[in-house]
Amino acid sequence: MKSDIHPAYEETTVVCGCGNTFQTRSTKPGGRIVVEVCSQCHPFYTGKQKILDSGGRVARFEKRYGKRKVGADKAVSTGK
């Protein structure tokens, strides 16, 4: 194996936007990494996850514009 090809692997402090900090190891120089979210504040880990209802979007579209009727297709296609 070649020697001196790997970067230095040093102790690093990770600081989250919520104020949580923890220690890890990283090759990033400086010894400090700042992140926006961590496992203490991310919605997936905290259980405050918002579930998107795509079926509700279809129902809302049909409510606004109605379902398309078969007779309407023929009138549009022969309207030259």
UniProtKB/Swiss-Prot annotation:
It comes from the Bacteria. Keywords: Metal-binding, Ribonucleoprotein, Ribosomal protein, RNA-binding, rRNA-binding, Zinc. InterPro entries: Ribosomal_bL28/bL31-like_sf, Ribosomal_bL31, Ribosomal_bL31_A, Ribosomal_bL31_sf. One of its GO terms (molecular function) is rRNA binding. Pfam families: Ribosomal_L31. Zn(2+) binds at residues 16, 18, 38, 41. Binds 1 zinc ion per subunit. One of its GO terms (cellular component) is ribosome. Belongs to the bacterial ribosomal protein bL31 family. Type A subfamily. Binds the 23S rRNA. This is Large ribosomal subunit protein bL31. The gene is rpmE.
